[in-house]
Design a protein with these regions (language model features):
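Membrane-interface helix-loop junctions in multi-pass transport and translocation proteins
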Residues: 1-6, 60, 64, 72, ...
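Juxtamembrane helix-entry segments on the extracytoplasmic side of multipass membrane proteins
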Residues: 2-5, 67-75, 163-168
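Membrane-water interface segments that mark the loop-to-transmembrane alpha-helix transition
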Residues: 3-7, 11-60, 73-79, 102-103, ...
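Generic alpha-helical transmembrane segments of integral inner-membrane proteins
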Residues: 13, 17, 45-57, 83, ...
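Membrane-interface junctions at transmembrane-helix termini in multi-pass inner-membrane proteins
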Residues: 25-34, 84-107, 121, 130, ...
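Membrane-interfacial segments
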Residues: 30, 62-70, 126, 130, ...
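Hydrophobic alpha-helix/TM-entry signal in multi-pass membrane transporters
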Residues: 40, 74, 90, 104-107, ...
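Interhelical loop/hinge segments that connect adjacent transmembrane helices in multipass membrane
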Residues: 102, 145-171
Length: 171
């Protein structure tokens, strides 16, 4: 299970680049526009896809560096979490901005319980480290679905350079 620890380093660094402080900038800004939210959403999506592609392509190098052949596919599969989470950063940010921690907690509890049950069942069935991968991806997928269902914010077809510059200056 140390393999997951090795991957977590790369995932955590990538997550930092995906957000780039934009969530904090949106929370700080008093009157966020639809253009602000949509701009950050598309930036997060693009960064999630680009960083996943980098992880996917470098999975063999990472695997060779740690001398762990199984790491190649673990990185590629668990790296999908970057894309999934990039789709929900704005959803979580809008809930935080509205101070709706109750809904955030409900979503976290439901996704943790359901993914935890799956992870335990897979571990009992002998899936080993893949049970942790499935648990992590399942938690992100469930959380994403619930955030999109209950939050109802939808992106517009807007990417504003002005919004990007203003918000990036904070992050």
């Amino acid at each position: 299970f140390g393999l997951i620890g090795m991957i977590t380093i790369f995932i955590a660094i990538s997550q930092t680049f995906i957000n780039s402080g934009f969530s904090s900038a949106l929370i700080r800004k008093k009157d966020c526009t639809q253009a602000d939210y949509s701009t950050v959403f598309y930036y997060n999506m693009a960064m999630g896809i680009v960083l996943y592609a980098v992880l996917y392509l470098s999975a063999g190098v990472i695997s060779n560096f740690f001398d762990e052949p199984e790491l190649k596919w673990l990185v590629r599969v668990l790296g999908l979490d970057l894309i999934i989470r990039s789709l929900t950063l704005i959803q979580g940010t809008t809930l935080t901005k509205r101070v709706d921690f109750k809904l955030q907690t409900k979503i976290a509890v439901v996704s943790s319980i359901l993914s935890g049950v799956l992870g335990i069942l897979m571990a009992v069935e002998g899936f080993g480290v893949w049970s942790l991968v499935a648990r992590s991806l399942t938690a992100s997928i469930i959380s994403s679905i619930l955030l999109w269902f209950w939050n109802r914010w939808k992106p517009s077809a807007i990417f504003s350079r002005e919004s990007f510059k203003e918000l990036f200056g904070f992050g």
